[in-house]
C-alpha cells in the first residue's frame, strides 16, 4: 500500500531496439539500456493529465515506475521519450505502429497483483540489419520494410 492507504502499483516494461523495423521482438533485436520512457495518465472524461512519471531502462532494457493511487477513471500509457543512441532512435509513428503501451491502474478490474506489465516498446534502427530477411523467413514473413530482397 502507498501513502494514505492508497494502492501502490509497479508498472514494469522493456525497451528494445527494433533492428528489423517490424515492430516486434526478433532474435536479432537488442535490449536498450538508458532509454527513457514516460507513463502518462489522463482522465477519460475531462482529458486532463492526472499522473506523469519518467523512468530510464537498466542494462537489460527493463524499467519500473511506481504509481501511488488508483487510476480507475484514467487511461494510462507508456510512451517512448528518448533513445540512448543515434543508431536506434526513431519512434514508430505510422498508423499501424504501437506507439504506446496501455496499462490499467485499478484494483477494480479483478487484477489482484500490484505489478502491471506493459507491452515492450521499440525504437527503430535507422536501417534494417542485413540478416533481417533471413530472420523474417524463419518467422514466415517475407516483407522487410526498407530492405531489398534478392531472388
UniProtKB/Swiss-Prot annotation:
Q: Where do glycans attach? A: 43
Question: Does the keyword field hold Secreted?
Answer: yes
User: In which broad location class does this protein mainly occur, judging by the first location in its UniProt entry?
Assistant: secreted
What GO cellular component entries does it have?
extracellular region
What is the protein name for this chain? Pollen allergen Sal k 5.0101
Q: List the disulfide bonds.
A: 17-88, 20-132, 41-76
Report the leader peptide range.
none
Q: Which PANTHER family match?
A: F28N24.16 PROTEIN, PROTEIN DOWNSTREAM OF FLC-RELATED
Write the record's keywords in alphabetical order, separated by commas. Answer: Allergen, Disulfide bond, Glycoprotein, Secreted
